[in-house]
Amino acid sequence: MDYRQLQLFLATAERLNLSHAAEAMSITQPGLSKSMHRLQRELGTRLYHRRGRGIELTESGRALLRHVKLMETQLADARSEVMGIASGKLGHARIGAGPSWLSRHLPESIARVMGEHPNVHFTVDTGFPDRLIGRLRLGELDVVVGALPDNRVDPDLRFMRLSSDVIRVVGRKEHPFARKRERTLADYAAQRWILPGRQELVRQRLARAFMLAGLAEPILAVETDSLSLKLATLRMTDCLGLTTTQILTQEEAQGIIALDHEALQFRREAGIVSRRHAELSPSVKLVIAELRKIAVKYGPN
């Protein structure tokens, strides 16, 4: 395989049409077809099948596409970092952050780095870990800061624990539960909830707690990964939600209280996720160093 072959494959896989790919890459269609045949012969497998006027990637083709996209991203990162070093800049840090990290720890870390290195450029994407880690695997993010998965055995990822916290049931201070001392799991199951997507660990834990008690999954009112939307909606309705003890102490959670049940408290560990075989840029290393200092400052919880 050579780089030109992989570029041609990427153009073909993204367009799913040999004619369009050939035009985009300024090559004749017979020339592109010949290059793709040679690549498939070298790999010993078919990368695509013809379907009408287009093509459809095989499983091998989809696997190669993931790696070629990652390679292109890493080459762009290398180019940016080398140019940054040459110009005296430390480069670009692309960070994915979970909701509870956006209001204090991450901004404090970024501010510290900017104070010492004003030429660093940050891009921050927000959301829950499942989606962000997917982007990390594709090379679209350098690191993800947020909740760590229970299973941390992954050949492609590196995990660094920074803190732990407790996820609790919350609602507005006027919620009927605030005046009800005895609350059963069935009471909670009968409420309407604001929750993240089904793929998120915290929602799976909640569903499992109800299942073990022989109850149906919670009634979903709003599905969102936006902390601000969740808190605002909780203040205006009698819905329930889940958030960390740390969030409850912050100004943005004013008017929101814990409405605990012992079966619905979940310990969560949080930290930094990065690609195991990727070299982190100086700017990303600076942010990680500051996050570690802040984790020590505020303690393990």
Task: Enumerate the predicted regions with their spans.
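Hydrophobic hinge/microswitch elements
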Residues: 128-141, 147, 199-257
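Beta-alpha-beta core module
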Residues: 153-160, 165, 180, 228-277
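Short helix-boundary/capping micro-motifs
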Residues: 11-31
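Secondary-structure junction motif
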Residues: 147, 177-183, 191-213, 280-288, ...
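Central regulatory/effector-binding core of bacterial HTH transcription factors
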Residues: 90-151, 216, 223-224
